[in-house]
Amino acid sequence: MASPAPPEPAEQGSPALAAAPQAPPPPTRAPPEEPEGAAPPEEGAAAGAGRQVEEAAGGVAAVVTWLLGEPALWLGGRADELLSWKRPLHSLLAFVGANLVFWFLALTPWRVYHLISVMILTRVIMQIIKDMILSRTRGAQLWRSLSESWEVINSKPDERPGFSHCLAESWMNFSIFLQEMSVFKQQSPGKFCLLVCSVCTFFTILGSYIPGVILSYLLLLCAFLCPLFKCNDIGQKIYSKIKSCLLKLDFGIREYINQKKRERSEADKEKSHKDDSELDFSALCPKISLTTAAKELSVSDTDVSEVSWTDNGTFNLSEGYTPQTDTSDDLDRPSEEVFSRDLSDFPSLENGTGTNDEDELSLGLPTELKRKKEQLDGGPRRSTEKKSAAGLSLPLSSDQTLHLMSDLAGDVITAAVTAAVKDQLAGVRQALSQAAPSLGEDTDTEEGDDFELLDQSELDQIESELGLSQDQEAEAQQNKKSSGFLSNLLGGH
């Protein structure tokens, strides 16, 4: 809806030209009467010069008013609309124009009178265009008068604060700041002087690093952008959006940190459990150092030392000594002591039948008991010989070598005694071969397996060459020798 407004007369043309016909004609002045004792002509000339200066100043003021008055008034009326960004397109164009004018004035090499000439030329062109557009038809004047008489009122309430309100609020805040600073100056002038000097020093340093043109342009930007942010609550909208994003980010970071804490606690629990299990295992299975074990094993075979059980589950042996156990008395020379102890029981009889040393080692035991003993000792003897032969090829320490050599010596002596006994009893077994032929075959087989002097093929060849008669004669002679030895040994039995 529209409301009538008081009509205002509008005249076309420049303000100076329009005001000229409306101004009343100056009243005619009567020629001044010369008072008595008129002033000299020099004073009249000075008064005329003063009037000319005043007229020239009035003309310059009229020209300046014509040149800048109407644009200034137009910009003043439109400033509220442009700076409040009610019409974004107009405000954007004004912002671009202000930037162009600023950088033109800042970068142009022209002098001041060149700039003034350009401003006057621009104003004349604007006035000509205005007269041509508004004075083309008569209806334009009528329409202009109606449009100025009636004003359109927007029924929608504008919730945004106006530019005048923003300016008023800013001016009020600035006035309050000045009042507080004046009170602060009265209460503590020294602190006020120090504060002012600090601010001036700050701006001096800032101006030495940043040119004044940049600072002026920043002021221009603030003049356009601060009302935009303040009147449209852009800062509040941006803050609300950023706050929502920050809340989401805070929640995400908090959840991530809590998850990492849970994972770290679980890892610590597993590590502690693993450490406990490792401690249990280490208690059950102690670790033995290789150097310590080698040092403990590097012992001599000369002296005997006591054995002590260490904490790590090994024997503690002093260097240069061998361990002593309950059964270590018979480990050095067991078979030699047994042989020397029983050697006195062997008969030392010379029967004049041409017997050799092997006949003297015969024990004269019954044939059946000796055969059973040979059958029982045949298998273990071969295994011990194989073990002793295999053990010689291994790298052994001194005590192990001593035990091995003692065992080997005992085995050799036992084998020699057994061989001698078998040789003496071979004749008796061959004499009984007719009653038990299988017994003679077993004896021949055992003799061949024990001594292994010839291969089986060589024995077969020798038997084929000599014949059975020679074998039978040798067996008869052997029976005579063995029977003579046994009769002398057993006596009246």
From Swiss-Prot:
- What is the superkingdom listed in this entry's lineage? Eukaryota
Show which residues sit on the Cytoplasmic side of the membrane.
Answer: 1-55, 109-114, 226-493
Q: Where is the composition biased (Basic and acidic residues)?
A: 330-344, 368-388
Give all Phosphoserine modified positions: 145, 147, 149
Composition bias type Polar residues, residue spans: 315-326, 467-486
InterPro entries, A to Z: RETR1_RHD (IPR055255), RETREG1/3 (IPR043384)
Compositional bias, Acidic residues, is annotated for 441-463
Q: Which residues lie on this side of the membrane: Lumenal?
A: 77-87, 136-204
User: Where is the motif LIR motif annotated in this sequence?
Assistant: 449-454
Region (Reticulon homology domain), start-end ranges: 80-229
Domain commentary: The LIR motif interacts with ATG8 family proteins and is necessary to target the ER fragments to autophagosomes for lysosomal degradation.
What is this protein's record name? Reticulophagy regulator 1
Species in which this protein is naturally found = Bos taurus (Bovine)
